[in-house]
């Protein structure tokens, strides 16, 4: 079997499947009443994931080292990670809207690797001496998985911002679930655009109320008095989310938090492994190389995100903006440094 031809075929097939999957997800978002589109989207993403895994396996057999040593290999490894995390997120949330945002990114990365990179960068070459280490798999693979996880989590935060754009949304569910009940409030929308929340406590007061005697000026009969004041809040109809969109926003907020919570420890482990490897290879744990600096910036951004959510109880728009910032920082750390700068990680630089 010609492994080189197999790899070339698989990278083109992966791109084609991801492109078709992206269109399916977009059609599903435009026409949600067509039931089989969501199944086709998930199936397409799973097939693309399998094709990329086979491509990486063929490259491993051909080159005899784990395929994350150059930009082409790392791009497809990143795409495989994104499709894997996508499938996990979709299964956890039950929201097919996830694919509307993740499939274009996965397709774009595979297109860049398969169609844009020069052919000489797509072939396997012997490892440079600095990469002939067991730390290659440990450090680079964990870093790439953290990038994939953080990218998907940040994408879902961006999706939250898009869905709730220009609208005031207050989420009151727990950050640890995907379908939390907004504090058991019964919410009903009235025609005069008044939002009325009736809490279980009010119902309990009504049920358990015992009348007490009160004299009136007109007669001396004993009457029962219970005065209940219901407070309503007038809300501009333009800022009210429909119950369906509010539920989707809640799911996206929660699942984004959980995925970023998975990606952050992976990033931490990857940075620590890289520091140990750097000490073995270059005699220093930290040298403020551009890649190291941006990895630290990435870590700080997502550390701030998790700190705000865990200790400050942030939900909704504020942490989503932090995650969206992290999305840009991850790409600078991964591609920007390699494409636009030189340093100890210059083996990926080609511009």
From Swiss-Prot:
Keyword Cytoplasm carried by entry: no
Membrane-topology annotation of the record: Multi-pass membrane protein
Superkingdom assignment: Bacteria
Any GO molecular function: heme binding
A matching Pfam family: Cytochrom_C_asm
One Gene Ontology CC term in the entry: plasma membrane-derived thylakoid membrane
Alphabetical GO biological process terms: cytochrome complex assembly
Keywords: Cytochrome c-type biogenesis, Membrane, Thylakoid, Transmembrane, Transmembrane helix
Main location: membrane
Annotated compartments: Cellular thylakoid membrane
Membrane-crossing segments per the record: 12-32, 37-57, 68-88, 97-117, 143-163, 259-279, 294-314, 320-340
Function: Required during biogenesis of c-type cytochromes (cytochrome c6 and cytochrome f) at the step of heme attachment.
Complex and partners: May interact with ccs1.
Family under the similarity heading: Belongs to the CcmF/CycK/Ccl1/NrfE/CcsA family.
UniProt-recorded name of the protein: Cytochrome c biogenesis protein CcsA
Organism: Trichodesmium erythraeum (strain IMS101)
Gene: ccsA
